[in-house]
Curated annotation (Swiss-Prot):
Organism, scientific name: Haemophilus influenzae (strain 86-028NP)
An annotated Gene Ontology molecular function: ATP binding
PANTHER family, sorted: UDP-N-ACETYLMURAMATE--L-ALANINE LIGASE, UDP-N-ACETYLMURAMATE--L-ALANINE LIGASE-RELATED
Record's GO cellular component terms: cytoplasm
Lineage per the UniProt record: Bacteria, Pseudomonadati, Pseudomonadota, Gammaproteobacteria, Pasteurellales
Protein name, per record: UDP-N-acetylmuramate--L-alanine ligase
Binding-site list for ATP: 125-131
Cited InterPro entries: Mur-like_cat_sf (IPR036565), Mur_ligase_C (IPR004101), Mur_ligase_C_dom_sf (IPR036615), Mur_ligase_cen (IPR013221), Mur_ligase_N (IPR000713), MurCDEF_pg_biosynth (IPR050061), UDP-N-AcMur_Ala_ligase_MurC (IPR005758)
Localization: Cytoplasm
Family assignment from sequence similarity: Belongs to the MurCDEF family.
Length: 475
């Protein structure tokens, strides 16, 4: 669906003077989704990124003007410039925008403008945001409500991470990493869990992070709804401070939407949800792990509270194929030592890695798990070093890639070599450090056994590396 510029006056009336919107870092998951929505609303979109890829190519095909690399002349004609939090202050396009007094806003500020005239559902939390956002989006789509959605990862069944719908509903992932979710004014807010992460934003103070989440929930109108996980002790500690209606979900006896009798067969989960009115709903999921049951129950709770029929909820959840890079099965391959399965997963925080390993163990029985792990950011590796040592010791074989810096400078003692040394000292697994990823296939062939599940784990380039591996193994 594409609108003329005249029609935009009706959609976002306050933005009628805006003609061209320029995105610095347009290839990022959150940025590209918003760019796609605005492109389909009829705005002229331009954007730049350091590398070309599937996302930038798709935007170019849809009509966006894409530049690879950053240069001052790229902002020509822009009415407003949108920046991702990854963009440094000395970026030439950002510097030029400020010199020319072109308004520069954060990604979340633009998302807030899109949400302003819609019924917004925002999903926040340390883990599970992308999957939960995708599940809610698919339920509303199944219910023929044609929602707009903007997600931080690919919604597999839609084949994209953003969609412009015709209805008033907007479902969006809310980003706490730079506290920019405070710009959003939703009608429903979901918080999946809360753990220390992105602590540089919160000056290393977890109490400040908690207070920021409460502030986010108070952006709800007095008639709004907060949906929170009852299994998370930090969230339950915050509930008395939230001056809005709160509905809870989880395995906890105290949950309003309570999960019972969870079982996993292979990579399929099934369980029962006891609703606040004691209605029992049997759920089937084709994505593994208790963490996905929690994500699905958050989505179910939102849908039930908003009056969506059970049939649409259950069909959408049963059909849900996952979000991009969340336990993404790349295939089974015959190698010299036998048949193996390769899975790509985005989890890069110790808790996420832990639940992925548990889901794999449940579905893969007594077979071995071989992990290819790429730490993401030196600061996260430093802050959660001991937790990484413990969780990475849970696999049967471990290949460690160098830290994916994500623009950070190296930190002494927070590199892959230090992580390998500490894991080896714990004595449960002997990690292999592979700095030259062109050697990865050869190293794997030396250690894999028949029936192994290979988990490529991390938020950096490990996904591209594992997909390249899958392509080479097909030939």
């Amino acid at each position: 669906m594409k609108h003329s510029h005249e029609e935009i006056r009706k959609i976002i009336p306050e933005m009628r003077r805006v003609q061209q919107i320029h995105f610095i870092g347009i290839g990022g998951a959150g940025m590209s989704g918003i760019a796609e929505i605005l492109l389909n609303e009829g705005y002229q979109i331009s954007g730049s990124d350091i590398a070309d890829g599937v996302v930038t190519q798709r935007l170019a095909q849809a009509g966006a003007k894409i530049y690879i690399g950053h240069a001052e002349e790229h902002i020509k004609g822009a009415s407003v410039v949108v920046v991702s939090s990854a963009i440094k202050d000395d970026n030439p396009e950002l510097v030029a925008s400020k010199q020319k007094r072109i308004p520069v806003i954060q990604r979340a500020q633009m998302l807030a403008e899109i949400m302003r005239f819609r019924h917004g559902i925002a999903v926040a939390g340390t883990h599970g945001k992308t999957t939960t956002t995708a599940m809610i989006s698919m339920i509303y789509t199944q219910a023929k409500l044609d929602p707009t959605f903007v997600n931080g990862g690919l919604v597999k069944s839609a084949g994209k991470n953003a969609h412009l719908g015709a209805s008033r509903y907007l479902i969006a992932e809310a980003d706490e990493s730079d506290a920019s979710f405070l710009h959003l004014q939703p009608m429903v807010s979901v918080v999946t869990n809360m753990e220390p992460d992105h602590m540089d934003t919160y000056e290393g103070d977890f109490e400040k992070m908690k207070a920021t989440y409460v502030k986010f929930l108070h952006n709800l109108p007095f008639y709004g709804l907060a949906v929170m996980c009852a299994d998370d002790p930090v969230l339950m500690e915050l509930v008395p401070k939230v001056g809005r209606q709160v509905i809870t979900y989880g395995f906890s006896e105290q949950a309003d939407y309570r999960i019972e009798d969870y079982e996993q067969t292979g990579f399929q989960g099934h369980y029962t949800v006891i609703c606040p009115n004691n209605e029992r709903i049997n759920v089937l999921l084709n994505v593994p792990g208790k963490h996905n049951a929690l994500n699905a129950t958050a989505a179910l709770a939102v849908a039930k509270e908003e009056g969506i029929a059970n049939e649409a909820i259950l069909e959408a959840l049963a059909d849900f194929q996952g979000a991009g890079r969340r336990f993404d099965q790349l295939g089974e391959f015959i190698r010299p030592n036998g048949k193996v399965r390769l899975v790509d997963d985005y989890g890069h925080h110790p808790t996420e890695v832990d639940v992925t390993i548990k889901a794999a163990r449940e579905g893969w029985g007594d077979k071995r798990i071989v992990m290819i792990f790429q730490p993401h950011r030196y600061s996260r590796t430093r802050d959660l070093f001991d937790d990484f040592v413990q969780v990475l010791s849970l696999v049967d074989a471990l290949i460690m890639l160098d830290v994916y810096a994500a623009g950070e400078a190296p930190i002494v003692g927070a590199d892959s070599k230090s992580l390998c040394r500490s894991i080896r000292n714990l004595g449960k697994v002997d990690p292999i450090l592979v700095s030259d990823t062109s050697q990865l296939g050869d190293v794997l062939d030396q250690i894999i056994q028949d029936g192994d599940l290979i988990l490529a784990q991390g938020a950096g380039s490990v996904s591209k590396i594992s997909r390249g591996l899958a392509e080479s193994w097909k030939n």
